Amino acid sequence: MPKPADHRNHAAVSTSVLSALFLGAGAALLSACSSPQHASTVPGTTPSIWTGSPAPSGLSGHDEESPGAQSLTSTLTAPDGTKVATAKFEFANGYATVTIATTGVGKLTPGFHGLHIHQVGKCEPNSVAPTGGAPGNFLSAGGHYHVPGHTGTPASGDLASLQVRGDGSAMLVTTTDAFTMDDLLSGAKTAIIIHAGADNFANIPPERYVQVNGTPGPDETTLTTGDAGKRVACGVIGSG
């Protein structure tokens, strides 16, 4: 007598066939809906991919130092020799980028501090100015630096003020085209000095203020110093 057909086996085969058909149809539909895109590193093509290579120049999100840049450094110390800050001067594209950073906390009082380049590369505590007079800390560095042929206010060596945080630390990045690297290294060289107080940049409106002798506007001391007070840290530029 013949065996009855195994309906369960037929059902399993039918299910497998149908599943394969549906999967094949789904793949065909997905293929039809997708554009034949291929990975490309050519700008403007899609889809974009990460290749593991560095970003092209100009696309990294920040400026890089120019290949021809030249630099000078300085370490600023207090009258007792304690290291207070470092300074770096980078020269490129016709101007200098000046970076000042404190080396620790608590060495400067919070607030604004005058910051200038001075005309002589000497940072001697309790010294006399080149023009003579009573001694004082770092007076050997002379007055604010002027490039040859420049006079008046602001001086060539006047920089943006350093703002010190509550913990006594600070950092400043500023730019200037008032001098070149050769200017800072010529002759007696130059020094960078942090002062005890803020610099008013001789901003004394003559229509509002008069001197004790009745002359309107800033006096000679204000014009030459900015009334920034004592010299609290000094470094010879180019000394490292």
Swiss-Prot record:
Pfam family of the protein (one): Sod_Cu
Gene Ontology biological-process annotations: cell redox homeostasis; removal of superoxide radicals; response to host; response to hydroperoxide; response to oxidative stress; symbiont-mediated detoxification of host-generated reactive oxygen species
Lipidation (N-palmitoyl cysteine): 33
Cofactor note: Binds 1 copper ion per subunit.
Activity modulation: Inhibited by the copper chelator diethyl dithiocarbamate.
Principal localisation: membrane
Family annotation (PROSITE patterns): PROKAR_LIPOPROTEIN, SOD_CU_ZN_2
Cysteine-cysteine disulfides: 123-234
Catalysis: reaction(s): 2 superoxide + 2 H(+) = H2O2 + O2
EC number: 1.15.1.1
Localization: Cell membrane
Entry's Gene Ontology cellular component terms: extracellular region; peptidoglycan-based cell wall; plasma membrane
Residues holding Cu cation: 116, 118, 144, 195
Lipidation positions, renumbered (S-diacylglycerol cysteine): 33
GO MF assignments: superoxide dismutase activity
Its job: Destroys radicals which are normally produced within the cells and which are toxic to biological systems. May play a role in favoring mycobacterial survival in phagocytes.
PANTHER family attached to this UniProt entry: SUPEROXIDE DISMUTASE CU-ZN -RELATED (PTHR10003)
Additional remark text: Does not bind zinc ions. Has normal enzyme activity in the absence of zinc ions.
Family the UniProt entry places it in: Belongs to the Cu-Zn superoxide dismutase family.
Protein name per its UniProtKB record: Superoxide dismutase [Cu-Zn]
